């Protein structure tokens, strides 16, 4: 289902000013990605406090939220994921970046699929927003208006609620 979300990371101060590049070999749990997109991904120079990508499919807590908690458990794996840019889906065994389907190129004039950067904490711009901060996943959206511990929420709510 096209329940859209955003995925954000509170950037470590030590990473500001550094340049990162998506690396398929650093994906957790034997995940792969749409190979058509890898050569289109550019470098990401971190200049602000938060990185955010758009995620198109299954953005609800028991969809992408569950994937984030179960597969993207540490800062470096999340940073690598976000350096891959906007995604159609990270659920399942294959990550499909947005540019794989749209043919978008990363260059100096087009940043449409690169992670967005901000100095302010992300707000909800889609149905759900996810944030990795202080070693934990948080979310807000339809069910909750304030940042809520995602793992605790998943442990206490079924996907049928």
Language model segments and positions:
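Short beta-strand scaffold segments in enzyme catalytic cores
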Residues: 4-9
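Intrinsic-disorder/low-complexity loop/linker signature
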Residues: 16, 26, 35, 42-43, ...
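Tryptophan-centered short beta-strand motifs
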Residues: 17, 48-50, 137
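Short, solvent-exposed aromatic-acidic interface loops
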Residues: 21-63
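Low-complexity intrinsically disordered segments
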Residues: 67-161
């Amino acid at each position: 289902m096209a329940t859209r979300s955003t995925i954000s990371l509170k950037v470590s101060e030590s990473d500001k000013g550094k340049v990162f590049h998506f690396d398929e070999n650093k994906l957790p749990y034997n995940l792969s990605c749409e190979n058509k997109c890898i050569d289109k991904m550019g470098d990401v120079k971190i200049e602000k406090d938060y990185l955010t990508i758009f995620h198109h499919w299954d953005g609800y807590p028991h969809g992408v939220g569950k994937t984030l908690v179960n597969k993207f458990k540490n800062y470096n794996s999340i940073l690598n994921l976000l350096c891959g840019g906007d995604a159609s889906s990270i659920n399942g065994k294959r990550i499909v970046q947005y540019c794989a389907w749209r043919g978008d190129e990363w260059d100096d004039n087009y940043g449409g699929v690169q992670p967005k950067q901000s100095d302010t904490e992300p707000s909800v711009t889609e149905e759900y927003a996810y944030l990795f901060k202080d070693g934990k996943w948080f979310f807000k959206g339809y069910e909750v208006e304030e940042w809520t511990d995602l793992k605790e929420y998943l442990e206490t709510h079924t996907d049928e609620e």
